[in-house]
Amino acid sequence: MIGSMGLRIPRATSSLLGRAVNAVATNQSAVAGASIAAQRRWQHYLMPLRDNFEQEGIRNFLSPGSVNMAYTEYQTFILEKLNALVVGTDFEQKDTKSIVLATARDPELAHVFNHASMAHNNHFFFDHLSPVPVKMGDKLFYHINENFGSVDTLRDEMIGTAVSMFGPGFVWLVRTQLPGQPVALRVMATYLAGSPYPGAHWRRQEMDAQTSIGSSPQGLSNGQRFFERSAAGFKGNKLEPTAPGGTDLIPILCLNTWEYAWLREYGTGVGGMGGKLAYAQSWWNMIDWAKVEEEARLETRILTGGDSSV
């Protein structure tokens, strides 16, 4: 029987405490080292977004919870799938864009293409957003007016294309240039995980902003050709290695129309409230136009009369 004296618990000596602290530190270092090693082993891991989007959200556009779902959770899911598909292959140490271009013409690697392209597109979308409104630069403003008539026309075209898409995908603003022709800007849409890059043209799953499938005879023929070559591709036919015409095309902005990006925040849009339209309209106000202009690599124009203009 112990009685009122109770049990005596000896104090830990300083040496014991020191060993314990060192053990904890060693264990933490081992965990951190394992994490770094895992990232090095797996080339494709979640890239942190700038401006603390995950913690603070994107003002007047997406809450932290929506960013977490649309980027942190979804991107992690896609990258885990991609890593499982490419482990032990040459693609393991290639970036997602390189994988997209390398697999787009091989029907047997369609599953690899889809995951790589989706990861690339989703990150591209978030990487061109800003926590505060950014003024459009003069050079980009000039080229948009040259190609679309006005900034408002470009806005309406991108938002209208997004809203009219029946299935999920991405709406892109691209810089394009044919051999011997001046630089042009155009809007294009890709369905599902389709890619805008010329090297992946057979898997663009494209709907041109000028003609949606089914809206005109030309649209019907475009849609028919897409489905025909998709069916042929999955029979094992190899597709030609480069895009016809040698078009130089660079995506400089995109809008994600997949429901995981907007449904949580904006709802279905029933009754005319919220929905994809409200999401697209809010997106336009938070574009990082400085980044768009930088990636567009636009040249200064010289107007008649000797006046220089961007």
Swiss-Prot record:
GO CC aspect terms: cytoplasm; mitochondrion
InterPro entries in the record: Mn/Fe_SOD_C, Mn/Fe_SOD_N_sf, SOD_C_sf
Gene3D superfamilies according to UniProt: Iron/manganese superoxide dismutase, C-terminal domain
GO molecular function, one term: metal ion binding
Subcellular localization, as worded in the UniProt entry: Mitochondrion
Domain of life, per lineage: Eukaryota
Assigned keywords, A-Z: Mitochondrion
Keyword flag Flavoprotein: no
Keyword Cell cycle: no
Pfam families per record: Sod_Fe_C
Record's function text: Component of the mitochondrial ribosome (mitoribosome), a dedicated translation machinery responsible for the synthesis of mitochondrial genome-encoded proteins, including at least some of the essential transmembrane subunits of the mitochondrial respiratory chain. The mitoribosomes are attached to the mitochondrial inner membrane and translation products are cotranslationally integrated into the membrane.
Annotated family: Belongs to the mitochondrion-specific ribosomal protein mS42 family.
Complex and partners: Component of the mitochondrial small ribosomal subunit (mt-SSU). Mature N.crassa 74S mitochondrial ribosomes consist of a small (37S) and a large (54S) subunit. The 37S small subunit contains a 16S ribosomal RNA (16S mt-rRNA) and 32 different proteins. The 54S large subunit contains a 23S rRNA (23S mt-rRNA) and 42 different proteins. mS42 forms a homodimer, in contrast to the mS42-mS43 heterodimer in yeast, building a large protuberance adjacent to the mRNA channel exit in the mt-SSU body.
Name the UniProt record assigns to this protein: Small ribosomal subunit protein mS42
Native source organism of the sequence: Neurospora crassa (strain ATCC 24698 / 74-OR23-1A / CBS 708.71 / DSM 1257 / FGSC 987)
Lineage: Eukaryota, Fungi, Dikarya, Ascomycota, Pezizomycotina
Gene: rsm26
